Amino acid sequence: MKTLPVLVLSLTLLTVFSETSPILTEKQAKQLLRSRRQDRPSKPGFPDEPMREYMHHLLALEHRAEEQFLEHWLNPHCKPHCDRNRIHPV
């Protein structure tokens, strides 16, 4: 029972007086965040830019919808319906 407080006290003193303290100063934390952000490439999925992956997905969907629309309207086999010169597209 006496060994538990002694163990806790010794671990506390060890972490405080050695340079391996798990508590960082504000300056060290900001520097760590800055260096980490510069080291890793900026690609979708990183917590720095959470919306970027979703925006890439939306752009791909929009591009695919536009291709399907043009493929439908420029199809030579559906002339009376798809001819923009004769019929206004709704």
Swiss-Prot record:
Keyword Mitochondrion appears in the UniProt entry: no
Query: What are the alphabetically sorted keywords of the record?
Result: Secreted, Signal
From the UniProt annotation, give the residues forming the signal peptide.
Answer: 1-18
Which is a Gene Ontology cellular component entry for this protein? extracellular region
Its subcellular locations are: Secreted
Q: Which Pfam families match?
A: DUF4543 (PF15076)
Give the start-end ranges of region Disordered: 28-50
Asked whether the UniProt record includes Cell inner membrane among its keywords, one would answer no
Instruction: Note the InterPro entries from the entry.
Output: DUF4543
Q: Which PANTHER family match?
A: GENE 525-RELATED
Instruction: State what protein this is by name.
Output: Uncharacterized protein C17orf67
Species of origin reads: Homo sapiens
